């Protein structure tokens, strides 16, 4: 089994992206699955082009993209991606799409095909803060999650795919009062446990991970 796991380069004025750094720290094998690590640009469309190049090159069974979500307290597997690009800031090539569809012929939304509740359970049992998220935003993270699930729906039905957001690391919040963070070691361990859950669970577990509002 092969797992392709991607991490974005730094964006938004940050000098580091914990998503990419945590991906780099992952072992090369998890639960007997080969781990293929890929850096992708925080750029609309180019990020998806690079992912598809690597789908064709490596033919992964599982594809997990990792992104930074500053302000979150834990590691948050995403439930759903929506068919909209609405960028509050420019990407790394100064693109700023507003109210545009990711793919014109795509569904309004796609749900992850990863066992996200099993992933959360693995992390929580290891003492790592984690919860299911119901919004991947409308920037490049959602763009990538939606695009990957679109490609799975249209062309690569045998791949399981989805997205995980991670918090800032401590060095990023030195001048951000009251902003939560998590050590890169805990983030990487959480991702390792998430991959383990994805490899070992063909279907998700049934446990309450919803929100009131």
Swiss-Prot record:
<feature type="active site">
    <location>
        <position position="141"/>
    </location>
</feature>
<comment type="subunit">
    <text>Homotetramer.</text>
</comment>
<protein>
    <recommendedName>
        <fullName>Pyrrolidone-carboxylate peptidase</fullName>
        <ecNumber>3.4.19.3</ecNumber>
    </recommendedName>
</protein>
<dbReference type="GO" id="GO:0016920">
    <property type="term" value="F:pyroglutamyl-peptidase activity"/>
</dbReference>
<dbReference type="InterPro" id="IPR016125">
    <property type="entry name" value="Peptidase_C15-like"/>
</dbReference>
<feature type="active site">
    <location>
        <position position="78"/>
    </location>
</feature>
<dbReference type="InterPro" id="IPR033694">
    <property type="entry name" value="PGPEP1_Cys_AS"/>
</dbReference>
<dbReference type="InterPro" id="IPR036440">
    <property type="entry name" value="Peptidase_C15-like_sf"/>
</dbReference>
<keyword id="KW-0788">Thiol protease</keyword>
<dbReference type="GO" id="GO:0006508">
    <property type="term" value="P:proteolysis"/>
</dbReference>
<dbReference type="GO" id="GO:0005829">
    <property type="term" value="C:cytosol"/>
</dbReference>
<dbReference type="Pfam" id="PF01470">
    <property type="entry name" value="Peptidase_C15"/>
</dbReference>
<comment type="similarity">
    <text>Belongs to the peptidase C15 family.</text>
</comment>
<dbReference type="InterPro" id="IPR033693">
    <property type="entry name" value="PGPEP1_Glu_AS"/>
</dbReference>
<dbReference type="InterPro" id="IPR029762">
    <property type="entry name" value="PGP-I_bact-type"/>
</dbReference>
<dbReference type="InterPro" id="IPR000816">
    <property type="entry name" value="Peptidase_C15"/>
</dbReference>
<keyword id="KW-0378">Hydrolase</keyword>
<comment type="function">
    <text>Removes 5-oxoproline from various penultimate amino acid residues except L-proline.</text>
</comment>
<feature type="active site">
    <location>
        <position position="165"/>
    </location>
</feature>
<keyword id="KW-0963">Cytoplasm</keyword>
<keyword id="KW-0645">Protease</keyword>
């Amino acid at each position: 089994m092969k797992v392709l796991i991607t991490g974005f380069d730094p964006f938004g004025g940050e000098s580091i992206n914990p998503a990419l750094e945590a991906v780099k720290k992952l072992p090369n094998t998890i639960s007997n699955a080969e781990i293929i690590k890929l850096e992708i640009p925080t750029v609309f469309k180019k990020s998806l082009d690079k992912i598809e190049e690597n789908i064709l090159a490596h033919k992964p069974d599982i594809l997990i993209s990792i992104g930074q979500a500053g302000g979150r307290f834990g590691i948050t597997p995403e439930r759903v991606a929506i068919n909209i690009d609405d960028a509050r800031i420019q990407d790394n090539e100064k693109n700023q799409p507003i109210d545009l569809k990711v793919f014109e012929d795509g569904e309004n939304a796609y749900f992850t095909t990863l066992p996200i509740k099993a992933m959360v359970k693995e992390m929580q049992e290891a003492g790592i803060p984690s919860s299911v998220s119901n919004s991947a935003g409308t920037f490049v993270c959602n763009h990538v999650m939606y695009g990957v699930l679109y490609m799975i729906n249209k062309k690569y039905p045998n791949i399981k795919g989805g997205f995980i957001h991670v918090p800032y690391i401590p060095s990023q919040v030195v001048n951000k009062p009251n902003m939560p963070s998590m050590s890169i070691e805990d983030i990487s361990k959480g991702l390792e446990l998430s991959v383990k859950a994805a490899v070992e669970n063909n279907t998700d577990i049934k446990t309450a991970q919803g929100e009131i509002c």
